[in-house]
Amino acid sequence: MKDMLVTPQRKTLRPHQVKALKMVRDSAAAGNRKIVCQLATGAGKTVLASRFIEGALEKGKRVMFTAPAVSLIDQSVSAFENEGITDIGVLQASHPRTNPDARVQVASVQTLARRDMPPVDLVIVDEAHIRAKVVEDLMQQRDDIFFIGLSATPWAKGMGLLWDDLICACTVSELIQQGFLSKFQVFAPDIPDLDGVKTVAGDYDSKQAEGVMSGKSIMGSIVENWLRNGENRPTLVFGVNRAHAASIAEDFQRAGVATAYIDAFTDVVERQQIERKFRSGEIKVACSVRTLTTGVDWPVSCIVDAAPTQSEILHLQKIGRGLRVNPGTEDLKVFDHAGNSLRLGLVTDIHHEELDKTPPKQRQKAEKKEKLPKACGNCGTLITGLVCPFCGHERKPIPGVETEDGELIEITEGERKVPTKQEKQDFYSMALWLAMKRGYKHGWAANLYRKKFGVWPRSLEEVMK
């Protein structure tokens, strides 16, 4: 398979793309036949895929490219044609590009599940983290086929049980530093209370989460904050479900903002019209649930996230829609009304070195977060360090106490000292401040105090620091 991955010299590739090609070839040379290539949203997955295809075609091989949705088929074909690949057939009923003799076949996983697999030597799986039974069955049954998976977020449960190797040529942070992805700034205008929301199939229950996010305070804040801080930027808004996203769209429209709503049932013609108007600036805001989380390269410079999630994959996919560098936009602003960045971390801090190997009936083990962001006390930007890179404000930690994973922990040396009343007051005051910042009641701070000291803070003053 190594000789199928020859790098064509037709175009100059970016350094991380050249590195990715080499890493995949090296992995193939080591005997791996099912390789996942991690590449951030906006980092050129299509160009990389075209190089894999060209290398295979040069050796007389046949290729199948699978997309996670029918709506992405034409987009994929156009992208490959722009890279000079023309011998393409589409595996889809009544499609004008249907050509079973073409050496490159493009199909959605939905169509592939209803068809016989054509003869191929290489299968490229786009958005490989979206697991499809037809692809997985093929991987288990056909040892003669070489598989390459493409994903910005290859962290789905059990991927390591199917794929042999994960390669990552460049992180999101490195791509931002090199100018290939946009710089971004995250704000948390609201911190919803999700304590009572149950978990269903690994994520927040949609109906209960909608109830929290549809409250007057948060719904009013979404539009008000955008009008005040959104700078009229082209914006994608993510809601909890269709009803919630449509309601947000109506609120924007009532405020006089040109807004569209799009979901999985939006027909192709209307979707194309919305995209055209969005690109021209006729539409400023597009609201959806998950329809716009993959395969979208619209010129976005603002993300409004109003959909709480426990999924790192979904979190990064949403923010990733705005990381692509576009002419006329210098950076990305993220307004996280769902608190996802506070719970899961900034997208530059989310990274996994290996594929997950959790068996089907076991729960995927959550990794401990190294450092979760907190709001800068001056400009409100979510940051992980003590000094804000945007305004220069320095957060002063309380001596002997630091924050970790949303809790206050005491740093001790040697024997534990008996805390003084002032130290207890300092801790309680900080807990009250943290509760205020997160929109919690004072009882949360009292419980945190009791957890640490074993008693309630009855003799202390309710003052914040």
Tell me what each language-model feature is.
Residues 2-38:
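Conserved pre-motif I regulatory segment
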Residues 31-52, 238:
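Walker A/P-loop
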Residues 57-81:
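Conserved Walker A/P-loop ATP-binding site and its immediately adjacent core
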Residues 90-100, 246-247, 257-289:
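Conserved helicase ATPase core of P-loop NTP-dependent helicases/translocases
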Residues 110-113, 131, 264-268, 275-351:
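Conserved RecA-like P-loop NTPase helicase motor core
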Residues 130-186:
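Post-DEXD/H (motif II) to motif III coupling segment of the RecA-like Helicase ATP-binding lobe
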Residues 166-239:
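Conserved interdomain linker/interface between the two RecA-like ATPase lobes of SF2 helicase motors
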Residues 313-317, 323-430:
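C-terminal helicase lobe
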